Protein backbone atom coordinates (compact mmCIF):
# COMPACT_ATOMS: atom_id res chain seq x y z
CA UNK A 1 0.00 0.00 0.00
CA UNK A 2 2.81 2.43 0.77
CA UNK A 3 4.07 2.40 -2.83
CA UNK A 4 0.56 2.96 -4.20
CA UNK A 5 0.02 5.93 -1.88
CA UNK A 6 3.09 7.65 -3.35
CA UNK A 7 1.79 7.30 -6.91
CA UNK A 8 -0.62 10.00 -8.15
CA UNK A 9 -4.29 9.02 -8.45
CA UNK A 10 -6.17 9.24 -11.74
CA UNK A 11 -7.10 12.74 -12.91
CA UNK A 12 -10.72 11.82 -13.58
CA UNK A 13 -13.03 9.43 -11.77
CA UNK A 14 -15.72 7.56 -13.72
CA UNK A 15 -19.34 8.57 -13.23
CA UNK A 16 -20.15 4.95 -12.37
CA UNK A 17 -17.79 5.22 -9.38
CA UNK A 18 -19.33 8.43 -8.05
CA UNK A 19 -22.81 6.93 -8.48
CA UNK A 20 -21.71 3.87 -6.52
CA UNK A 21 -20.27 6.11 -3.79
CA UNK A 22 -23.58 7.99 -3.47
CA UNK A 23 -25.49 4.70 -3.23
CA UNK A 24 -23.18 3.35 -0.51
CA UNK A 25 -23.29 6.66 1.37
CA UNK A 26 -27.04 6.27 1.72
CA UNK A 27 -26.44 2.94 3.49
CA UNK A 28 -23.56 4.12 5.70
CA UNK A 29 -24.28 2.97 9.25
CA UNK A 30 -21.30 0.93 10.49
CA UNK A 31 -17.51 0.80 10.37
CA UNK A 32 -17.78 -2.08 7.90
CA UNK A 33 -19.90 0.12 5.61
CA UNK A 34 -17.28 2.87 5.83
CA UNK A 35 -14.47 0.46 4.94
CA UNK A 36 -16.37 -0.70 1.85
CA UNK A 37 -17.04 2.89 0.83
CA UNK A 38 -13.38 3.90 1.15
CA UNK A 39 -12.23 0.90 -0.89
CA UNK A 40 -14.72 1.68 -3.68
CA UNK A 41 -13.38 5.25 -3.75
CA UNK A 42 -9.78 4.05 -3.87
CA UNK A 43 -10.59 1.73 -6.78
CA UNK A 44 -12.06 4.74 -8.55
CA UNK A 45 -8.91 6.77 -7.89
CA UNK A 46 -6.26 4.15 -8.62
CA UNK A 47 -7.96 1.55 -10.81
CA UNK A 48 -5.92 -1.65 -11.06
CA UNK A 49 -3.19 -0.15 -8.87
CA UNK A 50 -5.55 0.11 -5.89
CA UNK A 51 -4.74 -1.88 -2.75
CA UNK A 52 -7.71 -2.77 -0.53
CA UNK A 53 -7.66 -1.36 2.98
CA UNK A 54 -8.22 -4.00 5.65
CA UNK A 55 -10.29 -3.56 8.80
CA UNK A 56 -7.08 -3.81 10.85
CA UNK A 57 -5.53 -0.95 8.87
CA UNK A 58 -8.65 1.17 9.23
CA UNK A 59 -8.70 0.57 13.00
CA UNK A 60 -5.02 1.42 13.35
CA UNK A 61 -5.52 4.62 11.39
CA UNK A 62 -8.70 5.63 13.17
CA UNK A 63 -7.63 5.08 16.75
CA UNK A 64 -4.16 6.63 16.76
CA UNK A 65 -4.83 10.35 16.23
CA UNK A 66 -2.35 11.20 19.02
CA UNK A 67 0.45 9.13 17.48
CA UNK A 68 3.19 11.59 16.40
CA UNK A 69 4.46 9.14 13.77
CA UNK A 70 1.30 9.58 11.69
CA UNK A 71 2.61 12.87 10.24
CA UNK A 72 5.95 14.35 9.28
CA UNK A 73 6.54 18.10 9.29
CA UNK A 74 8.31 20.31 6.78
CA UNK A 75 8.19 23.95 5.67
CA UNK A 76 7.48 25.68 2.38
CA UNK A 77 8.18 29.36 1.62
CA UNK A 78 5.42 31.96 1.67
CA UNK A 79 5.23 34.79 -0.84
CA UNK A 80 6.73 37.12 1.76
CA UNK A 81 10.48 36.61 1.73
CA UNK A 82 11.87 34.88 4.80
CA UNK A 83 8.52 33.48 5.97
CA UNK A 84 7.56 29.81 5.85
CA UNK A 85 4.39 27.77 6.11
CA UNK A 86 4.47 24.60 8.20
CA UNK A 87 3.00 21.52 6.52
CA UNK A 88 2.04 18.36 8.41
CA UNK A 89 1.92 15.59 5.81
CA UNK A 90 0.43 12.15 6.61
CA UNK A 91 2.49 8.98 6.36
CA UNK A 92 1.74 6.99 3.15
CA UNK A 93 -0.89 4.56 4.48
CA UNK A 94 -2.84 7.28 6.25
CA UNK A 95 -2.59 9.52 3.17
CA UNK A 96 -3.89 6.69 1.00
CA UNK A 97 -6.97 6.20 3.19
CA UNK A 98 -7.53 9.97 3.37
CA UNK A 99 -7.46 10.17 -0.43
CA UNK A 100 -10.29 7.66 -0.65
CA UNK A 101 -12.24 9.42 2.08
CA UNK A 102 -11.70 12.76 0.39
CA UNK A 103 -13.25 11.49 -2.85
CA UNK A 104 -16.23 10.27 -0.83
CA UNK A 105 -16.72 13.69 0.80
CA UNK A 106 -16.29 15.55 -2.49
CA UNK A 107 -18.84 13.26 -4.14
CA UNK A 108 -21.60 13.49 -1.54
CA UNK A 109 -21.17 17.17 -0.61
CA UNK A 110 -21.64 20.28 -2.77
CA UNK A 111 -19.86 23.34 -1.30
CA UNK A 112 -21.44 26.78 -1.07
CA UNK A 113 -21.36 28.75 -4.32
CA UNK A 114 -19.02 31.31 -2.73
CA UNK A 115 -16.35 28.67 -1.96
CA UNK A 116 -13.78 28.77 -4.77
CA UNK A 117 -11.01 26.56 -3.41
CA UNK A 118 -10.71 22.77 -3.77
CA UNK A 119 -13.95 22.45 -5.73
CA UNK A 120 -14.18 20.90 -9.23
CA UNK A 121 -14.53 23.54 -11.97
CA UNK A 122 -13.74 26.36 -9.53
CA UNK A 123 -10.35 28.02 -8.98
CA UNK A 124 -8.56 31.24 -8.10
CA UNK A 125 -9.57 32.46 -11.56
CA UNK A 126 -13.31 31.84 -11.18
CA UNK A 127 -13.13 33.53 -7.77
CA UNK A 128 -11.24 36.52 -9.14
CA UNK A 129 -13.60 36.87 -12.10
CA UNK A 130 -16.45 37.73 -9.72
CA UNK A 131 -14.64 40.88 -8.63
CA UNK A 132 -13.54 42.25 -12.03
CA UNK A 133 -13.89 45.99 -12.59
CA UNK A 134 -15.13 46.90 -9.11
CA UNK A 135 -14.27 50.26 -7.54
CA UNK A 136 -13.14 48.67 -4.27
CA UNK A 137 -11.72 45.26 -3.37
CA UNK A 138 -11.49 44.30 0.31
CA UNK A 139 -9.37 41.27 1.26
CA UNK A 140 -9.09 39.62 4.65
CA UNK A 141 -7.25 36.53 5.86
CA UNK A 142 -8.30 34.06 8.57
CA UNK A 143 -5.49 33.42 11.04
CA UNK A 144 -4.35 29.83 11.74
CA UNK A 145 -7.26 28.63 9.62
CA UNK A 146 -6.82 24.84 9.64
CA UNK A 147 -5.88 24.63 13.32
CA UNK A 148 -9.01 26.60 14.25
CA UNK A 149 -11.15 23.68 13.06
CA UNK A 150 -11.20 21.14 15.90
CA UNK A 151 -12.19 17.49 15.89
CA UNK A 152 -15.24 18.36 18.00
CA UNK A 153 -16.38 20.84 15.40
CA UNK A 154 -15.98 18.30 12.60
CA UNK A 155 -17.75 15.56 14.55
CA UNK A 156 -20.68 17.88 15.26
CA UNK A 157 -20.96 18.76 11.57
CA UNK A 158 -20.88 15.13 10.42
CA UNK A 159 -23.65 14.12 12.82
CA UNK A 160 -25.84 17.05 11.70
CA UNK A 161 -27.70 17.76 8.45
CA UNK A 162 -27.08 17.07 5.62
CA UNK A 163 -24.77 14.22 6.71
CA UNK A 164 -26.60 12.84 9.78
CA UNK A 165 -23.97 10.11 10.28
CA UNK A 166 -24.03 7.56 13.07
CA UNK A 167 -21.89 8.77 15.98
CA UNK A 168 -19.38 5.91 15.73
CA UNK A 169 -18.90 6.38 11.98
CA UNK A 170 -18.54 10.15 12.40
CA UNK A 171 -15.98 9.51 15.15
CA UNK A 172 -13.87 7.26 12.91
CA UNK A 173 -13.89 9.80 10.07
CA UNK A 174 -12.96 12.55 12.53
CA UNK A 175 -10.04 10.54 13.91
CA UNK A 176 -8.75 9.79 10.42
CA UNK A 177 -8.93 13.44 9.37
CA UNK A 178 -7.61 15.16 12.51
CA UNK A 179 -4.35 15.07 14.45
CA UNK A 180 -2.89 16.34 17.71
CA UNK A 181 -1.79 19.87 16.83
CA UNK A 182 1.03 22.02 18.25
CA UNK A 183 -1.02 23.00 21.30
CA UNK A 184 -2.29 19.45 21.97
CA UNK A 185 -5.79 19.98 20.56
CA UNK A 186 -7.13 17.65 17.89
CA UNK A 187 -7.40 19.81 14.77
CA UNK A 188 -7.17 19.67 10.97
CA UNK A 189 -3.61 19.20 9.68
CA UNK A 190 -2.45 21.45 6.88
CA UNK A 191 -1.22 18.79 4.47
CA UNK A 192 -3.84 16.04 4.68
CA UNK A 193 -5.82 15.36 1.45
CA UNK A 194 -9.09 15.64 3.37
CA UNK A 195 -8.43 18.99 5.07
CA UNK A 196 -9.33 21.40 2.22
CA UNK A 197 -12.66 19.67 1.55
CA UNK A 198 -13.48 19.65 5.26
CA UNK A 199 -12.81 23.39 5.54
CA UNK A 200 -15.50 23.99 2.91
CA UNK A 201 -17.90 21.76 4.86
CA UNK A 202 -17.21 23.63 8.10
CA UNK A 203 -17.38 27.07 6.47
CA UNK A 204 -20.72 26.55 4.72
CA UNK A 205 -22.69 28.32 7.44
CA UNK A 206 -20.24 31.23 7.46
CA UNK A 207 -20.35 31.46 3.65
CA UNK A 208 -24.15 31.65 3.79
CA UNK A 209 -24.05 34.46 6.37
CA UNK A 210 -21.36 36.44 4.55
CA UNK A 211 -23.13 36.08 1.20
CA UNK A 212 -26.27 37.47 2.81
CA UNK A 213 -24.26 40.32 4.39
CA UNK A 214 -22.64 41.17 1.04
CA UNK A 215 -26.01 41.25 -0.71
CA UNK A 216 -27.40 43.62 1.93
CA UNK A 217 -24.61 46.12 1.13
CA UNK A 218 -24.55 45.63 -2.64
CA UNK A 219 -21.26 43.73 -2.57
CA UNK A 220 -19.86 40.53 -4.07
CA UNK A 221 -18.34 37.86 -1.83
CA UNK A 222 -16.04 34.88 -2.38
CA UNK A 223 -13.76 32.70 -0.26
CA UNK A 224 -10.73 30.66 -1.27
CA UNK A 225 -9.73 28.62 1.82
CA UNK A 226 -8.73 31.29 4.37
CA UNK A 227 -8.75 34.20 1.87
CA UNK A 228 -12.00 36.19 1.94
CA UNK A 229 -12.85 38.90 -0.60
CA UNK A 230 -15.60 41.50 -0.85
CA UNK A 231 -15.90 43.98 -3.71
CA UNK A 232 -18.27 46.72 -4.79
CA UNK A 233 -18.74 50.34 -5.79
CA UNK A 234 -19.62 51.85 -2.38
CA UNK A 235 -17.04 52.27 0.38
CA UNK A 236 -18.61 50.53 3.36
CA UNK A 237 -15.24 49.32 4.66
CA UNK A 238 -14.48 52.01 7.25
CA UNK A 239 -12.97 50.69 10.49
CA UNK A 240 -16.08 51.48 12.55
CA UNK A 241 -18.69 51.01 9.83
CA UNK A 242 -21.76 48.86 10.39
CA UNK A 243 -20.57 46.49 7.69
CA UNK A 244 -17.18 45.86 9.35
CA UNK A 245 -18.81 45.40 12.75
CA UNK A 246 -21.25 42.86 11.29
CA UNK A 247 -18.40 41.13 9.44
CA UNK A 248 -16.31 40.72 12.60
CA UNK A 249 -19.30 39.55 14.57
CA UNK A 250 -20.05 36.78 12.06
CA UNK A 251 -16.47 35.59 11.56
CA UNK A 252 -15.12 35.87 15.09
CA UNK A 253 -18.00 35.70 17.54
CA UNK A 254 -20.42 33.43 15.69
CA UNK A 255 -18.06 31.21 13.66
CA UNK A 256 -14.99 31.14 15.90
CA UNK A 257 -12.35 32.21 13.37
CA UNK A 258 -9.86 35.05 13.81
CA UNK A 259 -9.25 37.84 11.29
CA UNK A 260 -5.55 38.53 10.68
CA UNK A 261 -5.22 42.35 10.83
CA UNK A 262 -1.78 42.24 9.18
CA UNK A 263 -3.30 40.79 6.00
CA UNK A 264 -6.40 42.98 5.77
CA UNK A 265 -6.26 45.37 2.84
CA UNK A 266 -8.58 47.68 0.92
CA UNK A 267 -7.62 48.36 -2.71
CA UNK A 268 -9.11 51.21 -4.74
CA UNK A 269 -9.49 51.15 -8.51
CA UNK A 270 -6.32 53.21 -9.03
CA UNK A 271 -4.29 50.60 -7.15
CA UNK A 272 -3.43 47.07 -8.22
CA UNK A 273 -6.44 45.06 -7.05
CA UNK A 274 -5.71 41.40 -6.36
CA UNK A 275 -7.88 38.43 -5.42
CA UNK A 276 -5.91 35.33 -4.37
CA UNK A 277 -2.93 36.55 -6.40
CA UNK A 278 -4.90 37.38 -9.56
CA UNK A 279 -5.13 41.02 -10.66
CA UNK A 280 -8.77 42.07 -11.23
CA UNK A 281 -8.67 45.76 -12.18
CA UNK A 282 -9.99 45.29 -15.73
CA UNK A 283 -9.30 41.65 -16.62
CA UNK A 284 -7.72 38.67 -14.90
CA UNK A 285 -3.94 38.94 -14.84
CA UNK A 286 -0.88 37.81 -12.91
CA UNK A 287 1.56 40.21 -11.21
CA UNK A 288 4.47 41.48 -13.33
CA UNK A 289 7.02 39.85 -11.03
CA UNK A 290 5.48 36.45 -11.81
CA UNK A 291 6.08 36.76 -15.56
CA UNK A 292 9.48 38.33 -14.88
CA UNK A 293 10.52 35.36 -12.77
CA UNK A 294 9.45 32.96 -15.52
CA UNK A 295 11.42 34.90 -18.14
CA UNK A 296 14.52 34.91 -15.94
CA UNK A 297 14.40 31.13 -15.42
CA UNK A 298 13.97 30.51 -19.15
CA UNK A 299 16.74 33.00 -20.03
CA UNK A 300 19.21 31.36 -17.62
CA UNK A 301 18.46 27.96 -19.14
CA UNK A 302 18.80 29.26 -22.73
CA UNK A 303 22.09 31.08 -22.09
CA UNK A 304 23.88 28.75 -19.64
CA UNK A 305 22.28 25.35 -20.15
CA UNK A 306 20.08 23.24 -17.91
CA UNK A 307 22.61 22.29 -15.24
CA UNK A 308 23.81 25.84 -14.53
CA UNK A 309 20.22 27.13 -14.62
CA UNK A 310 19.28 24.42 -12.11
CA UNK A 311 22.16 25.49 -9.84
CA UNK A 312 21.10 29.16 -10.00
CA UNK A 313 17.50 28.13 -9.34
CA UNK A 314 18.48 26.14 -6.26
CA UNK A 315 20.61 29.01 -4.98
CA UNK A 316 18.06 31.80 -5.44
CA UNK A 317 14.63 30.17 -5.41
CA UNK A 318 14.79 26.96 -3.37
CA UNK A 319 14.68 27.55 0.42
CA UNK A 320 17.27 25.81 2.58
CA UNK A 321 15.06 23.40 4.48
CA UNK A 322 14.50 19.67 4.78
CA UNK A 323 11.77 17.38 5.98
CA UNK A 324 13.15 16.65 9.46
CA UNK A 325 10.85 13.77 10.33
CA UNK A 326 11.60 11.84 7.15
CA UNK A 327 15.18 12.94 6.63
CA UNK A 328 14.42 13.57 2.94
CA UNK A 329 15.12 16.92 1.29
CA UNK A 330 12.40 18.29 -0.99
CA UNK A 331 13.11 17.81 -4.70
CA UNK A 332 12.89 20.92 -6.90
CA UNK A 333 13.59 20.57 -10.63
CA UNK A 334 13.56 23.82 -12.58
CA UNK A 335 11.65 22.25 -15.49
CA UNK A 336 8.83 21.13 -13.16
CA UNK A 337 8.57 24.57 -11.56
CA UNK A 338 8.50 26.31 -14.95
CA UNK A 339 5.84 23.88 -16.21
CA UNK A 340 3.68 24.58 -13.15
CA UNK A 341 4.08 28.34 -13.52
CA UNK A 342 3.13 28.14 -17.20
CA UNK A 343 0.01 26.14 -16.38
CA UNK A 344 -1.02 28.81 -13.88
CA UNK A 345 -0.31 31.58 -16.41
CA UNK A 346 -2.43 29.73 -18.97
CA UNK A 347 -5.27 29.32 -16.46
CA UNK A 348 -5.30 33.04 -15.64
CA UNK A 349 -4.56 34.67 -19.02
CA UNK A 350 -5.88 31.97 -21.37
CA UNK A 351 -4.12 29.71 -23.88
CA UNK A 352 -4.39 32.31 -26.67
CA UNK A 353 -2.57 35.01 -24.67
CA UNK A 354 0.56 36.17 -26.54
CA UNK A 355 2.75 36.26 -23.42
CA UNK A 356 1.81 32.71 -22.47
CA UNK A 357 2.29 31.40 -26.02
CA UNK A 358 5.74 32.98 -26.35
CA UNK A 359 6.99 31.66 -23.01
CA UNK A 360 5.50 28.23 -23.65
CA UNK A 361 7.25 27.99 -27.04
CA UNK A 362 10.60 28.78 -25.41
CA UNK A 363 9.98 26.16 -22.73
CA UNK A 364 8.96 23.52 -25.30
CA UNK A 365 12.19 24.10 -27.25
CA UNK A 366 14.27 23.76 -24.08
CA UNK A 367 12.49 20.56 -23.09
CA UNK A 368 13.12 19.08 -26.57
CA UNK A 369 16.84 19.81 -26.17
CA UNK A 370 16.84 18.26 -22.69
CA UNK A 371 15.18 15.07 -23.98
CA UNK A 372 17.65 14.81 -26.87
CA UNK A 373 20.56 15.16 -24.45
CA UNK A 374 19.13 12.43 -22.24
CA UNK A 375 18.81 10.14 -25.29
CA UNK A 376 22.44 10.74 -26.29
CA UNK A 377 23.66 9.98 -22.76
CA UNK A 378 21.82 6.64 -22.83
Regions from the PLM with identified roles:
Residues 1-76, 86-136, 140, 145-149, ...:
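Right-hand nucleic-acid polymerase module
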Residues 70-73, 216-220:
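Short small/polar-residue motifs
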Residues 139-143, 191, 195, 217-234:
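Catalytic palm active-site di-aspartate
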Amino acid sequence: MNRTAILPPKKAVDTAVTTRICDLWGCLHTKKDLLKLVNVALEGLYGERACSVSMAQLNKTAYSSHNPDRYYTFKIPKKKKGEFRTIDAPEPTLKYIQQGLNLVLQTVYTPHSAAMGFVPRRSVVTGARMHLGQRLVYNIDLKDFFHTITSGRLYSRLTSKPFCLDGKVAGIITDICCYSGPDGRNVLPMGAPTSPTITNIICERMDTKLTRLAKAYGLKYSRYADDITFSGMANVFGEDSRFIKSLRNIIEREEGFTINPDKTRLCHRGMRQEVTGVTVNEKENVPRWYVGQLRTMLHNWEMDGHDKAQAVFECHYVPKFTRPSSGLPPIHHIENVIAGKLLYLKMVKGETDTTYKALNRRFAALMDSLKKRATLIK
